[in-house]
Amino acid sequence: MKRTVISSSNAYASKRSRLDIEHDFEQYHSLNKKYYPRPITRTGANQFNNKSRAKPMEIVEKLQKKQKTSFENVSTVMHWFRNDLRLYDNVGLYKSVALFQQLRQKNAKAKLYAVYVINEDDWRAHMDSGWKLMFIMGALKNLQQSLAELHIPLLLWEFHTPKSTLSNSKEFVEFFKEKCMNVSSGTGTIITANIEYQTDELYRDIRLLENEDHRLQLKYYHDSCIVAPGLITTDRGTNYSVFTPWYKKWVLYVNNYKKSTSEICHLHIIEPLKYNETFELKPFQYSLPDEFLQYIPKSKWCLPDVSEEAALSRLKDFLGTKSSKYNNEKDMLYLGGTSGLSVYVTTGRISTRLIVNQAFQSCNGQIMSKALKDNSSTQNFIKEVAWRDFYRHCMCNWPYTSMGMPYRLDTLDIKWENNPVAFEKWCTGNTGIPIVDAIMRKLLYTGYINNRSRMITASFLSKNLLIDWRWGERWFMKHLIDGDSSSNVGGWGFCSSTGIDAQPYFRVFNMDIQAKKYDPQMIFVKQWVPELISSENKRPENYPKPLVDLKHSRERALKVYKDAM
């Protein structure tokens, strides 16, 4: 297996350290065969479409309906934290507290716990980034302190097996059951958790729901979407595959269930009580292995504040000082025109319901204008939250999109060039196209780029370089601090014309126009490509020649796409 050293003389980084890190680029070329030895095929994907195979979300809902809550012989209630690492407005945690309070009326010795489960194989298989994992570990420590004030212990369980094993396995079910029984001394336990919509995670929950040990009662809740998947359908009862009509119905649905004139979403707030009479805070004994951090420059291990308070503060600051300029500044590469909330949303440090509630108060009671083109900056900010819901709804309806397959199965016929050298140069910001290189270097050094940056580089990889969009999708997941699988797959599908509500195949971003529009003074480019600082019209000798001619590569892409589609 080829391993390449990433080297950069980036001026931004050189003040601290060079980025000289061994990296295996081949891991991005396909799904990890260790975890997915038999990846889904086109035929298998179509089984979801023709209803010959049940969708995992439908199975979860069907099994849930069979569940009945019983407090008989139950001594413990436990909330299983996943991507919902917060106390404020957490549906599953709120339900857990409510169930515990009911149980306490029957069993005065009942206990309330919280748990987070680590499976490093899940991280490897899903290519979770070291940036994000560092943030999560910091958030867990902060969450443990916050829960301690409520006398709720946060347990940290590590799932390991001799073989590489995902959590959607019978081994995990046995592990989870044993851990729960250890906590409850063999008596009944009620576990609450918020649903994760990726296929692997849904199959994990299906296995747990199918577990026949009646001492375990699992209660799953919708939490990460403003509107739960399945509630917004066409007049024929099918799922939307185009955003705009879906978005209009989303707005209608949210307005119909508006809580009050000042709040549009119902929030789930737990009381600040001491829930267990006795409590002992036990520090976590887990540290992230080096393998998850080795491609991140140590000098850049400077993460955003991981606390819930920091997320709330960012939201307040954005709505108070920046949201009015969102339409004009969100795409600019050299400005911080976005909210900076994405990592907090991805890890669940803040709920999207709270975000929409706060933003709603700045919209004069209207979260969408009659004509979308007239949306205010804050209304368009809310629209971005809706996009996140949309991609989650779509992933539930077309599960194969989280299994390494495109929404448009006909695009599997595209004859990608898949030049591994070109891919490495794209990854490391050495394509010879300044705007692309600046964006990719920033991603390497910071773990974050804005949405416009993602669109520019995704279009260049899939159209100009004719490299399978899934290579880039995996690279982004491995390097983004806010990597979210449904949004990442959705965004790459849009730019590569292979996904849901994608741009037409003949739309290829013009890199020169993108640079002039979103970095007109080359402030961003010169920050991240210092080779160009002193150059005027000449290409410096220490800066690579363009990998492709933009005009000719566009023409090539149009032909290849047209032949396949």
Task: Please place each PLM-identified region on the residue numbering.
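Alpha-helical packing segments of well-folded alpha/beta enzyme cores
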Residues: G92, A139, L143, A311-F318, ...
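Trp/Phe/Arg-rich N-terminal binding region typifying the photolyase-homology
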Residues: K2-K258, E263, R441, S487, ...
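Active-site-proximal binding-pocket segments
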Residues: G340-K526
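Glycine/tryptophan-enriched, flexible segments
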Residues: S8-Y36, E72-N73, G237-D410, D519-M565
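Short, loop-centered acidic/histidine patches that primarily coordinate divalent metals
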Residues: E196, S497, E531-I533
